[in-house]
Amino acid sequence: MSFCYVRTISIALFLFIFLFLNNGNFKNNFYRKDNKYSSIKIRSFRSLAENQKVETEQSTPAKPEPTEFVNNDIHQNKNTFKKLKNNEKKKEILEEKMKDFVKLYVNKSSGECQRYRLQQHLKNYSSSNEYKKFMNKFVKFLKVHNDLNALKSQLHFNNVRAATIIFIAGFLSIFAILLTISAVAATSKFTNNMLAIAGVGALGSALSLPGMALLFVPAMLYVLNRKNEITNHYSERIIKQVSNF
């Protein structure tokens, strides 16, 4: 009887311990699952809140810049545009001035008034930094142009000299021929001697043609040599100046 009683108590105690342990495991599992579910739920709510924050930041328009900065930018843009426009206008005006006094010098450089105006143009615009290089080249061009004009004038004068010599030689030759004809005619009136008439004609021919040639050939040779000297002198100067461009 006592043995059965002890066995019953031990079985009941064992069942009680078993049930208690199972109940603790169940609670632990439940709390673990609950904590796991809570952490998942918290993470999901946190990510949802962050997404909503990003969407609100993207949807909200950016704050406009202060009107002072915008006005300053507009003012600076206007000033730069005005400066560019003024520089372009100045450049166009200076280019027109350059073209004008280039034409003035090339076309009308013979007059003293035009030369004075050209010198004034050079004084006014030679100090411009933008056109210093151009002005240097232009001055070199003026030197070449002056040398070409001097060469043309010297050659023209030399040609006039040669033409004058030829004209004088031709005139004197014709005059000598006419004088010879008149002398032959006068001799034929006074005498019928053909030898005398032929002698007068030969003397007149010798004076008119070879005599004039001997007189004017040195002058023509001098003119030709002078032409060669002028051409060589100015050609060397022009070549040196052109090589400095």
Swiss-Prot record:
Membrane topology annotation: Multi-pass membrane protein
Cytoplasmic membrane side: 26-164, 218-245
Record note on disruption phenotype: At the asexual blood stage, causes Maurer's cleft swelling and fragmentation, aberrant knob formation, with fewer and enlarged knobs, defective PfEMP1 trafficking characterized by impaired EMP1 surface expression and EMP1 accumulation at Maurer's clefts and a loss of adhesion of host infected erythrocytes to endothelial cell ligands. Infected erythrocytes have decreased cellular rigidity and increased osmotic fragility. Parasite growth is faster.
A GO biological-process term: cell-cell adhesion
Domain of life, per lineage: Eukaryota
Cellular location(s): Host cell membrane
Assigned keywords, A-Z: ATP-binding, Disulfide bond, Host cell membrane, Host membrane, Membrane, Nucleotide-binding, Signal, Transmembrane, Transmembrane helix
Signal peptide: 1-25
Disordered: annotated segments: 52-71
PEXEL motif, as annotated region: 46-50
Location, primary (coarse class): host cell
Record's description of how this protein is used: Potential vaccine candidate as CBP2-based peptides or antibodies against CBP2 prevent adhesion of infected erythrocytes to endothelial cells.
Record carries keyword Magnesium: no
Extracellular side stretches: 186-196
Binding partners and assembly: Monomer. May form (via the first cytoplasmic domain) homodimers or homotrimers; disulfide-linked. Interacts with MAHRP1. May interact (via first cytoplasmic domain) with SBP1; the interaction is likely to occur at the ring stage in the Maurer's clefts and is weaken by ATP. Interacts (via extracellular domain) with human chemokine CX3CL1; the interaction mediates the adhesion of infected erythrocytes with endothelial cells.
Protein's job: During the asexual blood stage and probably at the ring/trophozoite stages, plays a role in Maurer's cleft formation and/or morphology. Also, involved in the loading of the virulence factor EMP1 into the Maurer's cleft membrane. By binding to host chemokine CX3CL1, mediates the cytoadherence of host erythrocytes infected with parasite mature forms (late trophozoite and schizont) to endothelial cells, which sequesters them away from the circulation and thus prevents their elimination by the host spleen.
Comment field on protein domains: The first cytoplasmic domain binds ATP and nucleic acids such as RNA and DNA in vitro.
Name of the molecule in the record: CX3CL1-binding protein 2
Organism: Plasmodium falciparum (isolate 3D7)
Gene designation per UniProt: CBP2
